[in-house]
Amino acid sequence: MSFIPIVCGMKSFDSSYDTVPGHQNLYCPNCHNYSVGPIKRKEFFTIWFIPLVPVFWGKQLHCPICNWRQDFKNDEQLNKVIQEQQNLRQKQPN
């Protein structure tokens, strides 16, 4: 009888959501940097490094510094976050 190990895990594929300059460099509530941007994320369960079953498929705001993430469903939610960010920047003292 032979023993064949089954290697399984998770693999994520991130891609840019868009290249609009207003959607980049948003404020991160976790690390307090202006580095958050929207991404499209696909996460799969893998066996032998082959993606088989999709676990997550959606859009997120992502900070590459601290790896903070927040889901958003559509452009309306994204624009609401951007509007709130602009309000924060206007209220900051110089």
Curated annotation (Swiss-Prot):
Annotated localization: Cell membrane
Any one Gene Ontology cellular component term annotated for this protein: plasma membrane
Keywords on record: Cell membrane, Membrane
Membrane topology category: Peripheral membrane protein
Family indicated by similarity: Belongs to the UPF0768 family.
PANTHER family: UPF0768 PROTEIN YBL029C-A
Remarks, miscellaneous: Present with 996 molecules/cell in log phase SD medium.
UniProt name for this protein: UPF0768 protein YBL029C-A
Organism of this sequence: Saccharomyces cerevisiae (strain ATCC 204508 / S288c)
